[in-house]
Every structure is written in structure tokens, then in C-alpha cells.
Amino acid sequence: MKTKTNKPLIVMAVTFLLIVVVFFISLNLGVIKIAPLKTLQVFFGQGTARDELVLFEFRLPRIILSLLVGAGISVAGAILQSVSQNELAEPGILGINAGGSLAVVLFIYFFQGSASDLSFFGTFMLPFSALAGAILAAFLIYILAWKKGVTPIRLILVGIGVNAGFNALLLIFQLKMDPHDFMQAAVWISGSIWGANWNMIWAILPWIVILLLFTLYKARYLNIMQLGDQLATGLGTAVEKERRILLLAAVTLAASCVAAAGGIAFLGLIAPHVARRLTGPRHQTLIPVSAFIGSFLFLLADTLARNVLAPSEIPVGLVISVLGAPYFIYLLMKAN
């Protein structure tokens, strides 16, 4: 009994150690390689100006953003799977990411003029624009999937359709951009945190931290929802009210991550599933473990994306998709 109680803590401790290892590897690797000893010297204020620039202005913001986005997307996926009672639910598959991406591209196209020169104000407005698009996508999916209730398979099929529609609109507005912005938007939509900076971190940090804490606070309702709507209602839970609140939290988390990293598919599917297998379905432990696993997977994928074809770079979203697509197919076959 004691081992079962301690298992989530053990999983989080091991995952944290893995994050620390990849953190330092990611700091050292890149087009400009910095030896571990020199990295420590920089942190103690004894490094060269070049090493300080590379670490503090390029690599460290990117690593921190990877950890935040990985945690946010993974917890959003865990919420969606529980709220919809559908183990295949995930922000990318359901079209929520595509809605947020479309809103961000529209914001840049109409108000900022260039994807490469966002103002300080524009950077902080990105999560709000992504949230508007993600909420619109979620609303459309919920309305179109409703037919005397929402079945899991209908939710997935409608989500795929909405996803395709938003992606078509994305392409239309991309084609109206100049060639440089078109390429940047295409890479970003594929999932990329190239060009991560401290402004972007400060823009999404409050959203992700507050919503993670809020989700932990609401974990007991996610546990009850797993029992089914009738039993949950019998236990005195306002099921529809709590479902809408938690759905909004998941959409907002996903939108914040879209604003920072574009469309990241499958991470919100993989991390909660791995966490559930390791620690069980209790959301008081499932949520933090999902966040840890998601952060680790995203940071690992981004480190690979930066270095496998260096000096060229692969969008991190493509790396995650290569890993996640087979797992999604496996779950589909398992669910029959």
C-alpha cells in the first residue's frame, strides 16, 4: 500500500531527474557547442560575452519555453480525455490547436504586419488571440457533435473536420503573406519555438501556472466524471457546469501553448496515457505527472529537432508527430 502511495512521487522524481539531464545537454549542444565547464562558468558570472549571449538569450529561454509548453499541452490533453470520457481526445486532433493557430496568423496579418517583428504589446496579445480562435473551434466542435448528447466517435470525427477547415483557412492567409513571413508561419504552424525569448515566456507563464493550479483544484470533479454522468449527478455534482469550466481551462491552456509554439499534435495524447499507466486514473496525481512527462518529452524532442540536422532545424512538432502518430494508430486499433 505504501509503495502504491509513493509511486507517483517516484515517477515525478525520476522524470525530474531526466528533465535535469536533458536540460544540461540542451544547454551544451547546438551550432555553437559550449563545454559543461564553460556553462557552469557562465552561470557563476565568469563566462565570455559570446557564451553568455548564447545561453541567456537563446538557449535558456527556449528550454524554459519547452518545459512550459510541454506541461500545458499535456495537462490540456488529460482534461479533454476525462471531460469527454474519450481516451483519443487531444487539442491537436480535435481542431483546438488549428483554431488557435488561425487566430494568431490573422492577428499577425491584420495588426502586426510581419511575423518576424512582433512588438512587445503584440507578443503579450498572442495568447488572447489564440484563446479566441481556440474557443471558437471548441464551440463549433461541441455544437456540430451534439445530437442528443456527444458521443466519443462523433467528437473525434467532427474535430477532424473542423481541424481540416481551419487548416484550409490558415493556408489561404499564409498565401497572402510575403514569402519570408509565409515560411516562418509554415514552420511555426508545424510546431516550432525557434526564436523563443523572455517576452514570450512572461506572456504565457501566468496562464499556464494559474491554470495548472486551477486544474489541480478541480481534480476531484475530473475523478467523479470518470464514473459517468448519471452517477456523478447522483453524487451531487453539477456535471454540465463543471464540464464547461474544465473544457474552458483545457482550451485556454492549449491556446497559450499554441501562441508560443504553434500546432503541437499528439503530445496531449501521449503524456496523459503514459502518466495514467504509471500512476493510475486519480487526477490529483495524474495531472502533475502528465505535466512532468510532457515537459520532458517536449524538451527532448526540441533538443533532437535542434541538433539532428544542425545547422538546419526540424520543427519540434514534426518530431513529436513522428513519435505520436504510431501511438495514436495503436490506440485506435485497441479501441476498435
Curated annotation (Swiss-Prot):
Record's function text: Part of the ABC transporter complex FhuBGCD involved in iron(3+)-hydroxamate import. Responsible for the translocation of the substrate across the membrane.
Chain's gene name: fhuG
BP GO terms, sorted: siderophore-dependent iron import into cell
Entry membrane topology: Multi-pass membrane protein
Alphabetical list of InterPro entries matching this protein: ABC_BtuC-like, ABC_transptr_permease_BtuC
Protein name (record): Iron(3+)-hydroxamate import system permease protein FhuG
Subunit and interaction comment: The complex is composed of an ATP-binding protein (FhuC), two transmembrane proteins (FhuB and FhuG) and a solute-binding protein (FhuD or YxeB).
Location, primary (coarse class): membrane
Cellular component GO terms held in the UniProt record: plasma membrane
Any one GO MF annotation of this record: transmembrane transporter activity
Location(s) in or outside the cell: Cell membrane
Pfam families recorded: FecCD (PF01032)
Keywords recorded for this protein, A-Z: Cell membrane, Ion transport, Iron, Iron transport, Membrane, Transmembrane, Transmembrane helix, Transport
Family membership: Belongs to the binding-protein-dependent transport system permease family. FecCD subfamily.
Transmembrane segments: 9-29, 63-83, 91-111, 124-144, 155-175, 193-213, 245-265, 285-305, 313-333
